[in-house]
């Protein structure tokens, strides 16, 4: 694990991420689907600035350029609460776009999100799906 971590830190595409992981398909075929489930954590002690937490995963080309498609769970993006939304950062021109759909979520909510590859038009569709959004009491 340490070797992977050192390699990952050495190739940090943004020179600022705390950590990240990379995977390359041994067959060279594109990743067709990525899914994750997460539980919204408690509100942070400090809510803004560099202390505001955010979590995401993303899909991009094997060259590490072009569009980085990513569902994001972030605190403080729209106010003093958590939101989940989709975003796209384009490494080629530095542009940043977010989806018009942004959902407010609460600590304890269980969320799922996914990114699906569409072979027909060589695109990806992210979903910050709230279909499993529930709260444990």
Feature annotation, model-predicted:
Residues 6-137:
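Exposed, interaction-prone regions of secreted/extracellular proteins
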Residues 1-2:
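Classical eukaryotic N-terminal signal peptides for Sec-dependent ER targeting/secretion
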């Amino acid at each position: 694990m340490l070797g992977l971590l050192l390699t990952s830190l050495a190739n940090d595409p943004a020179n600022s991420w705390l950590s990240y992981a990379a995977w390359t398909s041994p067959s060279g075929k594109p990743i067709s689907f990525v899914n994750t489930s997460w539980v919204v954590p408690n509100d942070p002690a400090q809510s803004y600035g560099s202390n505001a937490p955010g979590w995401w995963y993303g899909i991009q080309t094997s060259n590490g350029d072009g569009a980085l498609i990513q569902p994001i769970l972030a605190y403080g993006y729209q106010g003093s609460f958590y939101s989940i939304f989709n975003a796209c950062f384009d490494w080629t021109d530095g542009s940043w776009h977010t989806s018009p759909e942004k959902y407010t979520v609460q600590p304890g909510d269980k969320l799922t999100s996914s990114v699906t590859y569409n072979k027909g038009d060589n695109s990806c569709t992210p979903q910050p799906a709230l279909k499993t959004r529930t709260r444990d009491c």
